[in-house]
Amino acid sequence: GVVTLNCARLGYQYAGNEAGLLAAVDNLVALGVDTLERRRAFVTEQLRNGLYPYTRRWLPSLDNHFSTIGVNGCNEMVRNFTHDAYDITDPRGKALTARLLDHINSLIVAAQEQTGHLFNLEATPAEGTTYRFAKEDRKRFPDIIHAGSEREPYYTNSSQLPVAHTPDPFAALEHQEELQSKYTGGTVLHLYMGSAMSDGKACAKLVRRALENFHLPYITITPTFSICPEHGYISGEHPHCPHCDQTTEMWTRVMGYFRPVESFNIGKKGEFHERQYFSETYV
């Protein structure tokens, strides 16, 4: 199971009070650990009772499986914490986020020792949670700072940079290296490109430079493309076909997988509309 912390709300509720924020994290992680332990016990019981016969054939127990604590909205946490004086792109905002992740990791180590079960810290993909957290918080706290617009609110994924921060992929890699290395579970930096790269050699060069010079666990190269009913694949973001002006179906990655933009939830559409693509010219 996965429990995700709403870091943006924490930044709002404990603005300027880091000790209070971390104390609240203590309580939330403790609640998360208790919830995940109950879930593990329930699923284990059902496994033993034969409710997962195919799983049981290959998986005698869940002892080697992790329970996960994740984070979402660290950029908005910093913005709310500082009354929008700066965000995660500022060294002070990045340092605050690093301290948060270190603190959660220490709590996870204690949880493992206490329970005897495996726990990890993950950059939760949060395909729907980025929007749901922001939507629910706006109902409770109308003046809370969020990304996107009033119509399309969302929180920035995990401890990622704001989606419109830079077109330079190496600037993003440099900023994210320290933060993403702190996760003990899943984390990835998606390099959203505005279109297909010029050729395979350019793509290979980008991947090689990224992996040789930085220590991020995972990266993806994510081009945006469009599909015309008449002319098929078109590289890049084209709401209408440049050949026949028909409405196209635009595709890009929504975290772990590619989907048509039209099927995105409201928050993810807001993120898509705000995104500044990384540029191949920096490679």
Predicted regions located by residue number:
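Long, C-terminal-biased catalytic regions of enzyme "large/alpha" subunits
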Residues: 1-283
